[in-house]
């Protein structure tokens, strides 16, 4: 039976019920709905709606219901209830009779679902923080293992300057640390309790909402009942955080897909995160990474979905807001599995140091060093840049690296070039000169790694 049937003389059509009911989605809020109901029973006991005996009986029945259903979603969905709130109330009435009908006194599904959703976001958000920390640790471990492997750094997907593989790893550590910080901030803003604000105007019963909030683990209650039931900022913010983090995951996946390709051959992925072809026996496909990249789109879609849903709603609850959960749940599921999978990929990744070093020595990645050499000889940088560009064109025509041009050939571009030029054109010199904070010299990467390990 619906919770609102008294106003109506006709039953809902089967099509409307199918269209309107949210239980197949919001059954995932069973724990939060019951926990919130237990707290609400205590709150209305304190204002005289329930006796202590009645409160105890409701608490016992609600805890029994939680034990029966927490790991059995099929039992919830099979009930045919309109939503998770209806399911809990109907199940409670079946257990304790008319006493169960008292529980909703002073409460609306509007503040109830807002509370459920914030409780769920808080719980899932903490789990996501753990997964982000695990991925961060996996990157730090990989950076430590391969800290001095030399590889080409790219701009425009063209070899630009040599870097250390450890430097590449720590670049993504920075990104995922920002993701952690953003999610922590979002969870702080979500840490306010909606319960006790009613449908939109507040509850008519003089309960202690501060005490109620604390009993549910919130830092404080919300302060405006109208805003409270209108608000889905926490959903939007978490979906936004997930979208940024998935963008980072997708970029890392793209890098690794390229590094793993036959054209690069920089890394080897473990068999446990790859698959083969049904036709081509030789294939070993980076499916885990490609799926991370692919799932990013659905997370972006959910963010745009909830933003579009909320953009023109008048204040207080509107049924449009029922559409918040399906996207949120999918976002959190996708983000979670991608974080776990990324950490697994990194744990088994092997670097082919011979190939990365060979690639770093190609593509005239030491050209900037030659320009800096000329600057040290007194030439303005813009002029040095032009001179080196001409030298590179000549080297390309001769199909030889810059460092293999003869001194006479180099001096044809500038008389400032002397025999000591060859010392600055080595890979070792290119890396060692990047000594400023944040650079890719081995000492800087070691310092950065030590700092990250201290903060784990």
From Swiss-Prot:
Q: Which gene encodes it?
A: argH
Give the GO biological process terms. arginine biosynthetic process via ornithine; L-arginine biosynthetic process
Family per similarity comment: Belongs to the lyase 1 family. Argininosuccinate lyase subfamily.
Keywords in alphabetical order: Amino-acid biosynthesis, Arginine biosynthesis, Cytoplasm, Lyase
Q: Which GO terms describe its cellular component?
A: cytosol
Would you tell me the protein name for this molecule? Argininosuccinate lyase
Q: Which pathway does UniProt place it in?
A: Amino-acid biosynthesis; L-arginine biosynthesis; L-arginine from L-ornithine and carbamoyl phosphate: step 3/3
This entry's Enzyme Commission designation comes to: 4.3.2.1
Q: List the subcellular locations.
A: Cytoplasm
How would you classify this enzyme at the top EC level?
A: lyase
Q: List the disulfide bonds.
A: none
């Amino acid at each position: 039976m619906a919770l609102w049937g008294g106003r109506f003389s006709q039953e809902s059509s089967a099509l409307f019920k199918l269209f309107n009911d949210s239980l197949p989605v919001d059954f995932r809020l069973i724990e939060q709905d019951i926990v919130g109901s237990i707290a609400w029973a205590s709150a209305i006991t304190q204002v005289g709606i329930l006796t202590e005996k009645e409160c105890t009986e409701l608490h016992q029945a609600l805890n029994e219901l939680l034990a029966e259903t927490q790991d059995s979603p099929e039992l919830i969905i099979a009930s045919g209830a309109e939503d998770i709130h209806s399911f809990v109330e109907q199940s409670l009435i079946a257990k304790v009779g008319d006493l169960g009908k008292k529980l909703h006194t002073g409460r609306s599904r509007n503040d109830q679902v807002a509370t459920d959703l914030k409780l769920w976001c808080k719980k899932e958000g903490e789990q996501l923080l753990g997964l982000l920390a695990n991925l961060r640790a996996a990157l730090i471990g990989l950076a430590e293992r391969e800290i001095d492997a030399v590889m080409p750094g790219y701009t425009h997907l063209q070899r630009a300057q040599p870097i250390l593989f450890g430097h590449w790893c720590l670049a993504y550590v920075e990104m995922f640390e920002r993701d952690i910080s953003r999610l922590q901030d979002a969870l702080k803003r979500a840490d306010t309790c909606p319960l006790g604000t009613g449908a939109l105007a507040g509850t008519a019963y003089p309960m202690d909402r501060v005490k109620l909030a604390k009993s549910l683990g919130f830092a404080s209650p919300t302060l405006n009942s109208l805003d409270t039931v209108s608000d889905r900022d926490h959903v939007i913010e978490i979906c936004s955080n997930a979208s940024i983090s998935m963008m980072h995951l997708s970029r890392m996946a793209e890098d690794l897909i390229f590094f793993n390709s036959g054209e690069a051959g920089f890394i080897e992925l473990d068999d446990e995160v790859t698959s083969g072809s049904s036709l081509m026996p030789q294939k070993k496909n980076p499916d885990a990474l490609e799926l991370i990249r692919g799932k990013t789109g659905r997370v972006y879609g959910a963010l745009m979905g909830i933003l579009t849903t909320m953009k023109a709603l008048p204040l207080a609850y509107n049924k449009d807001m029922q559409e918040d959960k399906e996207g949120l749940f999918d976002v959190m599921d996708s983000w979670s599995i991608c974080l776990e999978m990324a950490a697994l990929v990194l744990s088994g990744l092997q670097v082919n140091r011979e190939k990365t070093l060979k690639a770093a020595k190609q593509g005239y990645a030491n050209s900037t060093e030659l320009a800096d050499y000329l600057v040290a000889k007194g030439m303005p940088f813009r002029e040095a840049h032009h001179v080196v560009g001409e030298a590179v064109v000549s080297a390309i025509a001769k199909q030889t690296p810059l460092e293999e041009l003869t001194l006479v050939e180099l001096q044809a571009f500038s008389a400032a070039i002397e025999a000591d030029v060859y010392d600055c054109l080595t890979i070792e010199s290119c890396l060692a000169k990047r000594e400023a904070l944040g650079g890719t010299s081995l000492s800087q990467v070691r310092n950065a790694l030590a700092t990250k390990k201290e903060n784990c």
